[in-house]
C-alpha cells in the first residue's frame, strides 16, 4: 500500500510502528512542532480525548459510510472493526479446554498468558473492556475481581505492544495471548501452530 501511494503521489513515507499509547505520547510531545501527518490504529476513546492533537478532516465519502461508523469527531475516521480473541498454542495447552475468559484462571497457566499494557495498547484496552463486559460490566465488583485474578496469573509479564503478544504465542514462548482478530487469523492462514478462540462469553468489536 505504501509503495503504491509513494509512486502515485511522489511523496516519501516514513513509517513508525509502535503501540498506540506510545504513538499518542509521541504526538503529545511533538504538538508544538508536529512531525507526523497521519496515525492509524487506536480506539475512539483515545481520539475523543486527544482532539487538540489533530486537524479537522472529514472524507468526502463519509456520507456513504453506514451511519454508526461515520466520522463524528471531525478529525478521526473509523477504518476497521476488530474483535478481541484468544490466541492459543495447542502444544502448550494440551489437556486444557480453553473456550473463553473463565478458562484462563488455571494455575498451570501462571506466567504463560501474554498481554500488552491496556494503557499503551488499544487491543489490550479492548480486551480489558471485553472481559469486564463478559464478567458483569465496569461497575461490577466481581468483574474487577476477575481482572485482578487474571493479572495475578499473568505474573507481571506484560508486553509493550500488541504484536509481541501474538508473536510470543505463535513462537511457542507463551501458551495463550489476549489478542485481536486480524493478526491472529493472518498467522493462522500462514500456517502458524495456533488456535483462534472467540470467547464463549462474547467478544466486542471496536
Protein language model features and the residues they cover:
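Extracytoplasmic ligand-binding site segments that recognize negatively charged/polar headgroups
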Residues: 1, 18-22, 28, 34-173
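Short, polar/charged alpha-helical segment
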Residues: 1-12, 187-188
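Short, structurally constrained coil/turn elements
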Residues: 7-9, 32, 109, 190
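Generic structural signal for residues in well-ordered beta-strands
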Residues: 13-15, 113, 194-196
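Conserved beta-strand termini and adjacent loop/short-helix elements that scaffold enzyme active sites
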Residues: 16-18, 116, 179, 199
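A ligand-binding cleft/hinge motif common to bilobed small-molecule-binding domains
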Residues: 45-50, 170-194
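Periplasmic-binding protein-like
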Residues: 146-151, 158-159, 190-206
Amino acid at each position: 500500500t505504501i509503495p503504491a501511494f509513494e509512486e502515485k503521489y511522489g511523496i516519501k513515507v516514513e513509517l513508525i510502528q509502535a503501540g498506540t499509547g506510545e504513538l499518542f505520547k509521541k504526538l503529545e510531545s511533538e504538538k508544538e512542532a508536529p512531525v507526523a501527518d497521519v496515525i492509524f490504529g487506536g480506539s475512539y476513546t483515545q481520539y475523543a480525548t486527544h482532539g487538540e492533537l489533530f486537524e479537522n478532516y472529514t472524507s468526502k465519502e463519509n456520507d456513504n459510510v453506514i451511519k454508526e461508523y461515520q466520522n463524528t469527531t471531525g478529525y478521526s475516521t473509523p477504518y476497521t472493526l476488530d474483535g478481541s480473541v484468544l490466541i492459543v498454542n495447542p502444544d502448550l495447552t494440551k489437556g486444557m479446554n480453553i473456550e473463553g475468559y473463565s478458562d484462563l484462571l488455571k494455575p498451570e497457566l501462571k506466567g504463560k498468558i501474554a498481554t500488552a499494557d491496556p494503557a499503551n495498547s488499544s487491543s489490550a484496552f479492548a480486551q480489558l473492556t471485553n472481559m469486564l463486559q463478559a464478567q458483569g460490566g465496569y461497575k461490577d465488583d466481581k468483574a474487577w475481581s476477575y481482572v485482578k485474578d487474571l493479572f495475578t496469573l499473568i505474573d507481571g509479564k506484560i508486553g509493550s505492544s500488541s504484536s509481541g503478544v501474538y508473536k510470543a504465542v505463535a513462537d511457542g514462548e507463551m501458551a495463550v495471548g489476549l489478542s485481536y482478530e486480524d493478526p491472529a487469523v493472518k498467522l493462522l492462514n500462514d500456517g502458524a501452530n495456533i488456535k483462534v478462540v472467540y470467547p464463549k462469553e462474547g467478544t466486542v468489536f471496536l
